[in-house]
């Protein structure tokens, strides 16, 4: 019997070591790759929204710099298409792409032409077409010759503020979900993680591990 137990222990040792190594890899990906990058996105998006509140002009160099910094931060996490970024279409709200039918400029043009009051409050703005939200919408408002001069300057200003505030809200929500629950779910599965939901979390953990070399 002792020989059988010893043999089983020897046989299972590599599996235990593999599981521990995999868990360590997932932990490293989350703590060194995912969370720092989403923190940067949230911080730069907050700075973008604050800059727009101070100067919403499309020609503002400060606003364009803030946009570039926040957009670069988004690009750094845009491959992490699982978990909190997919809740409520947050990733699409940040970057509606691809846009083969030109929905973003069409949506923005309609908003500006109608001076749509949806831009006046965060709750109503969050209900507009997702094509009119996020970084690509802001890019049109800052750099497109037609949209950056169309309609009322006051309304364009309000729209820029609405878009940037929404970007900040979505970015912060993704980070908050990672920090307050989702990371722990991947790092510390419980007995309840067995079954279909557990397999789903295991697949997500595997996907999380896959990004370690990016």
Task: Locate predicted features.
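Sec-dependent N-terminal signal peptides
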Residues: 4-13
């Amino acid at each position: 019997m002792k020989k059988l137990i010893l043999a089983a222990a020897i046989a299972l040792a590599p599996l235990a070591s593999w599981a521990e190594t995999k868990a360590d890899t997932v932990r490293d990906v989350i703590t060194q790759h995912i969370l720092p990058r989403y923190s940067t996105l949230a911080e730069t998006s907050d700075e973008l929204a604050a800059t727009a509140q101070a100067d919403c002009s499309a020609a503002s160099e400060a606003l364009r710099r803030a946009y570039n910094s926040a957009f670069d931060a988004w690009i750094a996490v845009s491959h992490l298409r699982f978990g909190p970024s997919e809740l409520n279409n947050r990733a699409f709200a940040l970057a509606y792409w691809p846009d083969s039918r030109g929905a973003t400029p069409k949506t923005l043009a309609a908003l500006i032409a109608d001076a749509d009051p949806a831009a006046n409050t965060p709750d109503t703005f969050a209900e507009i077409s997702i094509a009119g939200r996020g970084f690509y919408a802001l890019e049109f408002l800052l750099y497109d010759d037609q949209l950056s001069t169309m309609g009322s300057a006051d309304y364009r200003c309000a729209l820029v503020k609405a878009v940037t505030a929404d970007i900040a809200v979505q970015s912060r929500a993704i980070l908050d979900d990672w920090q307050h629950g989702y990371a722990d779910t991947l790092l510390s599965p419980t007995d309840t993680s067995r079954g279909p939901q557990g397999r789903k979390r295991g697949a997500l953990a595997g996907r999380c591990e896959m990004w370690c070399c990016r």
